């Protein structure tokens, strides 16, 4: 797992954009190309290895694959919970199998119902669970600490990042500290792009004491399951989330004065 992922320079409409390549945290073979894994591993540090860990992995998510590997490294038995379907990624299941995890199949249903079923199963069987969307202070602090090193070196006017559920982006935004900076005479702006409800993201940020008029949440016109496979990005970029954020930046870059950093959380396989 590569912790010190690079910041690269990429061109967008004859403009230089800094790109944090957190997708390079995993190699796409042993681990998924995903910048969340250092934070997830920080959560595992505080688990009791005597008890198994179960996690619900929805189709398209790399969480089950990542946890199967990270838990194996820490001697924690991992149970991969999922609802089988014709479209569920066999590639991801096979990657998890390579790490000798156990599988717990569920009947397909709404996400909230599936999560409650897994939670009930865990309580009955003395099995550990991680917070939904990894929403825990240890996870967010890990992201913040890693981002601190980035923003010490790269003083930018705009941070562009996929909102996701609001959890991962919140740790990075806390580090960036948007708004007026009296020392540099700047007004740093955050632009997060969501595929869901804008107010949901603002509420998540508010729950983590992040509230600023310098945070702008925009909803993409593309649906969640539109992977934008025909849209070209100059680096590996996840179609579910990050690709939509880069497309947003391509449409809006002329309105953003100053230096821009795009935080790429996930690549593609």
Where are these regions (language model features)?
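PLP-dependent amino-acid enzyme catalytic core
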Residues: 1-269
């Amino acid at each position: 797992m590569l912790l010190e992922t690079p910041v690269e320079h990429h061109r967008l409409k004859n403009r230089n954009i800094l790109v944090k390549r957190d997708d390079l945290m995993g190699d796409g073979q042993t681990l998924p190309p995903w910048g969340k894994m250092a934070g997830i591993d920080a959560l595992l540090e505080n688990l009791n290895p005597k008890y198994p860990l179960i996690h619900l992995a929805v189709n398209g998510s790399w969480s089950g694959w990542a946890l199967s590997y990270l838990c194996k490294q820490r001697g924690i038995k991992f149970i991969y919970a999922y609802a089988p379907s014709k479209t569920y990624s066999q590639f991801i299941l096979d990657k998890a199998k390579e790490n000798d995890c156990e599988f717990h199949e569920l009947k397909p249903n709404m996400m909230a119902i599936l999560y409650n079923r897994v939670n009930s199963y865990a309580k009955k069987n003395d099995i550990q669970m991680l917070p939904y969307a990894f929403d825990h202070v240890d996870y967010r602090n890990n992201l913040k600490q890693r981002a601190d090193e980035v923003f010490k070196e790269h003083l930018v006017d705009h941070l562009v990042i996929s909102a996701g559920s609001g959890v991962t982006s919140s740790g990075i935004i806390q580090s960036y500290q948007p708004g007026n900076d009296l020392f540099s005479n700047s007004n740093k702006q955050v632009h997060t792009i969501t595929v869901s409800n804008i107010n949901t993201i603002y509420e998540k940020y508010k729950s983590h004491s992040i509230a600023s008029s310098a945070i702008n949440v925009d909803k993409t016109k593309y649906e969640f399951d539109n992977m934008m496979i025909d849209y070209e990005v100059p680096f590996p970029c996840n179609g579910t989330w990050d690709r939509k954020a880069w497309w947003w930046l391509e449409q809006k870059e002329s309105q953003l004065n100053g230096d821009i950093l795009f935080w790429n959380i996930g690549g593609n396989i």
